Amino acid sequence: MTYAIETQALTKRYGKNTALDGVDLVVETGSVFGMIGPNGAGKTTAMRLLLDIIRPTSGSATVLGQSPITGGAALRRDIGFLPGELLLEGRVTGRSLLKHYAEISGPVAPGRIDALAERLGLDLTRHVRTLSKGNKQKLGLVQAFMHEPKLLVLDEPTSGLDPLVQQEFLSMVREAQHNGQTVFLSSHVLSEIQNAADQVAVLRNGTVVKVGDVASLRASAVRRVVIDFTDAAADDIRTALLALPQLDNLTVADGEVIQVTGTVEGHIDALVKAIAPFHVVDLRVEEQDLESSVIDLYSNEANK
Amino acid sequence: MSQTMTRSILPLTRRNLADSWRGLLGWTAGVAGAILLYVPLYSSFSGDNAGFEDIIGSLPDGLASTLGFQDLASGAGYVQATYLGLIGFVLFTIAATLWSSAAIAGDEESGSLELTLAHGVSRVQIMAERSFGVVLRLLWLSVVSALLILALNDSSGIDLEPAHVIGGCVALFGLGVLAASFGLAIGAITGRRSFASAAAAGISLLGYILNSLGNQSADVDWLHNLSPYYWAFGNSPLSEGADWGSLGLIFGISAVVLVLGGFVFNRRDVSA
């Protein structure tokens, strides 16, 4: 097995502040690897290290078999990068800007830019500074994908994109994978990348908390449930639910509508079966924001 | 070799120029306006009845020498005092300050340098090409200056040797390049536009002040030796021709400063 990205104890400190703390990651060639974590977890720092925009304090990284520092410009021609905060300015059209980036990246096949722009619904004749955030993001995606690089490094690629374009983006990722390209992407929301990524690493405070496939991560994710009942006794419901080991933080608010809230770790099967005898008016299962589910993951890891 | 075929010549310099041509147009108009305003006025001052010398004589002691107005009666002295040594110098300093601080530090502060760096270009290439873009724009303003002064040479009566006009404009160009090299290097080292601007404007101002102080008396004449402004203009290039040795020193220092800036830039983290 070859690795498109391999890091060993990769560490980046800014003064006393540790942005990335001894991260070991391997991304298999041809895979789609997601990195999730709250803002400030170190996702962007890790990506900048891979592109030699910043240098590690200690540890090392290998990208496409080379160190980003010694690989230099030639290595970066084989990478397509989308920065997390894409700032595009200037009185130039999208087409002219992309032409410039094509000149300083790997060779771009004729017609490729137009094909990508059309897929994403991006107007290349407009001046860059007049573009909305979503359209700038599309421009950023085009410049990352256009030279069909061996490795795509995409920081929060779906941010600002509407759901239809997100779908198109996911199909571009799948095509890239089909072509043998490797995709390394980040998000602060698991749901945005769960359909794309084979493997996911959860980052928190600069360390990798967990690595696994999406299914196993989802199974261990903590979700918040809200259930409304009518025509039932609050005490009966409480008794039935207290018996469930997966359910925590239970509250039962009595009234005409009895509202039950709680958090569920893992599958919700047992919960659904436990409430089946009662009259359920509404059932909402919400994925917690990643901040809290990562905290749960983190504390679970610490307790084991 | 297919990769080298798609590589084009100086992509970053061309982008730099393409992004800035509107601004350059404005600077060209400013430089042209200053020359077209000041140089033709010489004929109205230079006549026997103009009393120009009397006006200078009436200025407080030291002010005339501070402003470099000792020799306003000759065409060379007049163009030196009004354009090359004053308005032109100020315009070149401001242009060099703005352009050099924007080239690396401004781009870094705005966040767009990150994306350029992520492509197939080295830091050294970015430093070299963007510096070249700034130098080219300053060269353009120098060429415009020389051509306009030469165009007005007869009609205004300044009566300068064409080679000396070119020498004087090369000296002005040199001071612009020196200021720009400090702005580019400090911008590349610190990534801060304010530091870059301070360095570029500061080196010009320092040279001007040292020269003015050196003009005051023979006791402090040695201050001239420290002033790039004096290196460029001290020998009165419009009447005597350029002092190529001193200009070589100015361009040499600029090159060293740029190399130092590129050296540090190549080794530091780029922030966003």
Model-identified regions with their sequence ranges:
Chain A
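ABC transporter nucleotide-binding domains
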Residues: 2-7, 12-204, 208-210
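Generic beta-strand hydrophobic packing signal
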Residues: 8-10, 250, 283
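Hydrophobic alpha-helical segments typical of transmembrane helices
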Residues: 97, 112, 116, 213, ...
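Structural motif
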Residues: 149, 245-248, 278-279
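ABC transporter nucleotide-binding domain
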Residues: 169-261
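C-terminal coupling/interaction segments
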Residues: 263-304
